[in-house]
Amino acid sequence: MKLAIAALLAGSAAAFAPAQSGKASTALNMAFESELGAQPPLGFFDPLGMLADADQERFDRLRYVEVKHGRIAHVAFLGQIVTRNGIHLSGNIDYAGNSFDSFPNGWAAISGPDAIPQAGLLQIVAFVGILELAVMKDVTGEGEFPGDFRNGALDFGWDTFDEETKLSKRAIELNNGRAAMMGILGLMVHEQLGGSIPIVGEM
């Protein structure tokens, strides 16, 4: 769990939060202050110095990581809400007859007395690995920006938008991804603390 929390924080730390006053920025950092993502209500923030002496390639790499973690957090947060409200896939998860709803929600499904068997966890890791290495990336090399995984197959009308609309939608995704990262982190913490919270219910 500590690893998951660290990954969520590291993925977003270089891109947002209030600008610090009284400290001179380097010329490179000043160039990044106008990048997409340095936007209200938080502005530009690099508390860990991850952009110190960084070039555009490193910035793009960090932005790619942030976008990817934001998308994962979206799915994770939605999954928490759905399963904790009693909605699960039908049928059995294995040949032993264990149903999807027979396993606990949240982190308890990964680590605990009633967790998913190791073979099941290995399947999850393998599936995520395949997505990471072969699917969720710019396969064709034609991506317009970090996180553009259309690969000539998915569009959803993106090319019909003007540049202002594209920037707006990308900014919205960044902000929502940041909120989702903090949201799933909050749920993970509350799960360890116990108790009940609105919408999600009993942790």
UniProtKB/Swiss-Prot annotation:
The keyword Glycosyltransferase does not apply. Coiled coil: none annotated. It is found in: Plastid, Chloroplast thylakoid membrane. InterPro entries: Chloro_AB-bd_pln (IPR001344), Chloroa_b-bind (IPR022796). GO terms for cellular component: chloroplast thylakoid membrane; light-harvesting complex; photosystem II. It comes from the Eukaryota. GO terms for biological process: photosynthesis, light harvesting. Residues 1-30 form a transit peptide. Keywords: Chlorophyll, Chloroplast, Chromophore, Light-harvesting polypeptide, Membrane, Photosynthesis, Photosystem II, Plastid, Thylakoid, Transit peptide, Transmembrane. GO terms for molecular function: chlorophyll binding. The light-harvesting complex (LHC) functions as a light receptor, it captures and delivers excitation energy to photosystems with which it is closely associated. Energy is transferred from the carotenoid and chlorophyll C (or B) to chlorophyll A and the photosynthetic reaction centers where it is used to synthesize ATP and reducing power. Belongs to the fucoxanthin chlorophyll protein family. The LHC complex of chromophytic algae is composed of fucoxanthin, chlorophyll A and C bound non-covalently by fucoxanthin chlorophyll proteins (FCPs). The ratio of pigments in this LHC is; fucoxanthin: chlorophyll C: chlorophyll A; (0.6-1): (0.1-0.3): (1). This is Fucoxanthin-chlorophyll a-c binding protein, chloroplastic.
